[in-house]
């Protein structure tokens, strides 16, 4: 199995294994799905952290309004009355004005937070350092865990306009957002390795050979964005260590230049006649009377 270290730009994303005989059409779609799936889990975790703190989303026509404005316009949050967290709600106002402030109690909040941490760990970039490959099954498992936690805390479900429910139903609208720019459509995804595009019409082995123990750094890119930057010769960590070494060396040389003390000339090892006296047997002669 060829090991692919998938990156976006210079940032590590995940590890993935594939046989050398894999069609690049299939592999590119697979990489794009895992990449986008990880982004989906990250978006859900971010929104669920807000859900744990401030409750469900307000209706779009009530978001950003003050209590006085809501009362003046006679607006009512009907879904807020239906979607009550299990065990009762604790009021915690959302300063941004996106959520209704009816947060879950401490026990239910911990259910959400613990599940969020577990889901983050599954798709974490630290999996690269640990040598763990991320598969679509793992991404789906993380999504299922998040869905289950929401169902436990909100047995009556979430409003249809809540971004968490929309994510679970694949109805999310990311147009005009930074999150939307990060997503790469499967049909427009490209894989690059060694400054070459891995064309979908070929097999992986056409580029990396038939050695199944090969490890490559593959960069995922949106079509039309051009070739990604080449990998640096040394990593950022190695560069830091190199700079630190030269800085220490420079400081050491600087101290030696400043130290013009010649007291070392009185040391035995600095005496150029010591060897001669040693062979003549006059090494430890003292001229003073005892």
Swiss-Prot record:
One of its GO terms (cellular component) is cytosol. GO terms for biological process: cilium assembly; regulation of cilium movement. The modification Phosphotyrosine is found at residue 264. The keyword Phosphoprotein applies. Its main location: cytoplasm. It is found in: Cytoplasm; Cytoplasm, Cytoskeleton, Cilium basal body. Keywords: Cell projection, Ciliopathy, Cilium, Cytoplasm, Cytoskeleton, Kartagener syndrome, Phosphoprotein, Primary ciliary dyskinesia. It holds the Pfam family CFAP298. It is linked to Ciliary dyskinesia, primary, 26: A disorder characterized by abnormalities of motile cilia. Respiratory infections leading to chronic inflammation and bronchiectasis are recurrent, due to defects in the respiratory cilia. Patients may exhibit randomization of left-right body asymmetry and situs inversus, due to dysfunction of monocilia at the embryonic node. Primary ciliary dyskinesia associated with situs inversus is referred to as Kartagener syndrome. Belongs to the CFAP298 family. Plays a role in motile cilium function, possibly by acting on outer dynein arm assembly. Seems to be important for initiation rather than maintenance of cilium motility. Required for correct positioning of the cilium at the apical cell surface, suggesting an additional role in the planar cell polarity (PCP) pathway. May suppress canonical Wnt signaling activity. Interacts with ZMYND10. This is Cilia- and flagella-associated protein 298. The gene is CFAP298.
